Structures are given as C-alpha cells and as structure tokens.
Amino acid sequence: MAADSSRVYRRLMALEPRAQSLCAWQGKVLRNTLSAGSEPEQVQELGRLGSSYRHLCTLSGVSTDVLDECRNQYHDTAREMAFVLHKQAQRLKRLATYQLAAQVYREFLGTFEGEKASVEVAFYLAECLWQIAALSPASDTIRWSEAAEQYTRVIHLDPAGRFVKEAAYAAVLAWQNALYLDDDDLKRRPATTL
C-alpha cells in the first residue's frame, strides 16, 4: 500500500514540478519510506524533501505558509533522523550507520547552518566523523582531518558555547591522530601553532 501511494505521489511530482503541493507530496513519500524503507532509502527521500524545499524557494507565487510548512517539515525531520541514526550507530557500532547519520547532519547544515540548533548538529557531525575515522578499516589522515576540522568549526560557530571545551580537546586529539603523533612525538617536536 505504501509503495503504491509513493508511486502515485512521485508521478504527481513528475507531472506538476511547479505545484505548491510538491513538498507535501514528497513529505508523504518520505513518511511511507520511514515506515517501510531501509535506512539508505530514508536518507535518500529526506534529500529529495530538501531538494523540493529548495526548488519551492526558487518559484515565484508560492505562499509563505506553504514555504514555512515545507521548511519546518524538512528541518524537523532532518534533525530527528540524524539524531536517531546517530543513536543507533552508537548502540550498534556500525560504520555504515555513522556514515548515514553524518550524511543527514551535513544535509541539515547545508540548509540550516545559521540557526541556533546548528551548533549542536555541527558538534554531533564531528562526533560521527570521529567514529567514522576510528571504525574505518584503513583509518587515514583524511578521515581524522575531517573530524578535526569539524570540531574546529564547532568552536568557531559558538566560541562561548557549551560544546567548546569538548570540541577543542577532540580537535587536538583528531589532529594528533591525523598526523600519527603519539605523546612522545609531541614532547620531542612541540607544535609551533595550534
């Protein structure tokens, strides 16, 4: 039943790409996928909801109420999905689930970075990137550098915020891992800048 419903909504979206109901239709496809689809499918449909929102923003004549409703649905669903995937990844210690959570965090930040909640989301993205680096079979400089850069970004987003101390400490450790330094290396070669 959900698959049939989703097929109908997809057909409507293909026939009427400028309809004000575009986001509502994609939201229903996403809801169907959340109840019956795999995690990668859910993340894909969330991305499509984001694309629908961004597309509606470019159209003229779309009512403010429709845009606000679409924005709120996308914002809330993306944030909640990222948190759920992150918690599940922590429980299962699955690299693939951390990667999906990171993808959704990035999706959220790509649209809502300037918002108050974005600092928390940015921090949790950094946490996911740390775990991705730690769990990857071939942990390398690039993965650890991504985590370090994201922690550093959290510090810049809110220098007096609640995540600063933990982000600063984690950034130092991630850079240390990226550079393959242990404590003895640090004693022999002190860093000139941080």
Which stretches of residues belong to each language-model region?
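Acidic, polar-rich low-complexity tracts and alpha-helical solenoid repeat scaffolds
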Residues: 1-194
